[in-house]
C-alpha cells in the first residue's frame, strides 16, 4: 500500500507544472474579457465606479483595467507571476466588496463565488510560482547557469 502511495505522490509532484500552467491560463482567460471591456469604454467604467461609490473612479478605472490587462499577458507567459498576483487579488477583493458581496456566495446570483475562486488560484500562484512552463522558470534557470 505504501508503494502505491509513493507512486501516486511521484505522479502528483510531476503534475505540478502542468497544473500551475492550467491555473495561469484559466485566470488569463477569466481576466481577458473584463479587461478588454474596461478599455473599450473606460469613461463608462469610471461612471459606473462612481455610481457604486468607488473612490477616485476615473483613476481606479484605469488602475483596474491596467492591472487586469497586464495580468492577462503576464499570467499567459508566466512572467512576474508572483508579483502580478497580488494586485489582481486586490482587484478581486474590491470587486467582492463593491459588487458581489450583496448577492451572497452563488455565482448564479452574481455572488462572490467566482472572484473568490480567482483569489484562491492567485494565492496558489503566489505560494508555488508559475511552474516550469513559464518565462519565470526560464529566467531563473538562465540566472543559475550564468553564475
Model regions and ranges:
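Extended, low-polarity transmembrane helix blocks
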Residues: 1-40, 58-66, 70-147
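Perimembrane loop-to-helix junctions flanking transmembrane segments
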Residues: 45-56
